């Protein structure tokens, strides 16, 4: 068996340690691999903090959260946040435009609309609304589902927390239970709608669940720009809302080597972010997502963009292309 200190070290380093300790001396050969790894981690931590400092609330627009913050009642904010996260795919400005259109069709605000909602009445109000794959019919079904939930449980937070287990590492299991519960509420209607399941992905299916994790970020985190509506879920349990754009950036700065954007990648990246902030690992998400939303980290490398980017000291692309 290997000594615990030798695990995951290159053979040359492990052999050097064995030879030194076997010669009857307490002197240890310096582990350059560990030193290098610590140096990289230090650079990345500095880069992430610089990135967070570069983007404050003034960089929020265009973002679906802008629309949510237009409501003042926490009950409206919770429902608006849920719908806004579900439809947070595609062009950011179009998302914001379509969300404002959607909420303008909800008399009395999102909470009042949903709690009074029935499939037929909801469908009438929402006729003609569409966002890419989804139409007003999908919103009507989801409103009916939420109506069942809110009448019985009072809030989405209470339903979500039923699946939260003591000692959980993250929200994964609770999110699975939450999605399963919602899918069951209007099962027949859900199964009839071709793209409805796209609105409610689950970690159990391997999905990264970017939009649901985004919803959780908004309602759980108490720091700007998020809402902090929920008080029974710890920010330390949140998982990074991972899409292809954020995943690409995470690869470039060494947070993952995985190729598939799925739940495993989201958990891995979150775990590494915990090294820099165990209590609030996804506080970096807002700033990371600005790079994609605002076009500050395009697919095509641009020396002017790269040299100004706070992440360049940790970016593999920046180093490999000799831009440093």
What are the functions of these language-model segments?
Residues 2, 14-17, 27-324:
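HhH-family (HhH-GPD) DNA N-glycosylase catalytic core used in base-excision repair
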């Amino acid at each position: 068996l290997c000594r615990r200190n030798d695990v995951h070290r290159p053979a040359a380093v492990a052999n050097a340690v064995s030879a030194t300790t076997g010669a009857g001396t307490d002197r240890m050969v310096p582990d350059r691999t560990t030193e290098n790894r610590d140096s990289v981690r230090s650079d990345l931590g500095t880069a992430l903090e610089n990135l967070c400092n570069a983007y404050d609330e003034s960089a929020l627009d265009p973002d679906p959260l802008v629309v949510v913050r237009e409501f003042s009642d926490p009950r409206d904010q919770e429902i608006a946040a849920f719908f806004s996260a579900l439809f947070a795919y595609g062009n950011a400005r179009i998302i914001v435009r379509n969300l404002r259109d959607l909420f303008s069709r909800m008399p009395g605000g999102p909470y009042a609309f949903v709690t009074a909602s029935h499939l037929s009445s909801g469908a009438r109000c929402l006729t003609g609304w569409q966002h890419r794959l989804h139409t007003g019919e999908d919103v009507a079904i989801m409103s009916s589902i939420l109506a069942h939930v809110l009448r019985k449980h009072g809030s989405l937070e209470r339903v979500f927390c039923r699946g939260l287990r003591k000692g959980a590492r993250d929200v994964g299991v609770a999110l699975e239970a939450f999605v399963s519960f919602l899918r069951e509420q209007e099962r027949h209607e859900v199964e009839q709608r071709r793209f409805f399941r796209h609105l409610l992905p689950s970690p159990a299916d391997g999905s990264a669940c970017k939009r649901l994790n985004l919803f959780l970020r908004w309602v759980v985190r108490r720091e700007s720009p998020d809402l902090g509506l929920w008080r029974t879920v710890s920010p330390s349990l949140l998982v990074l809302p991972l899409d292809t754009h954020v995943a690409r950036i995470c690869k470039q700065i060494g947070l993952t080597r995985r190729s598939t954007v799925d739940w495993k990648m989201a958990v891995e990246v979150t775990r590494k972010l915990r090294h820099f902030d165990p209590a609030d690992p996804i506080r970096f998400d807002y700033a990371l997502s600005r790079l994609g939303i605002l076009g500050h980290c395009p697919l095509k490398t641009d020396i002017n963009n790269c040299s100004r980017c706070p992440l360049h000291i940790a970016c593999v692309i920046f180093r490999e292309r000799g831009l440093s």
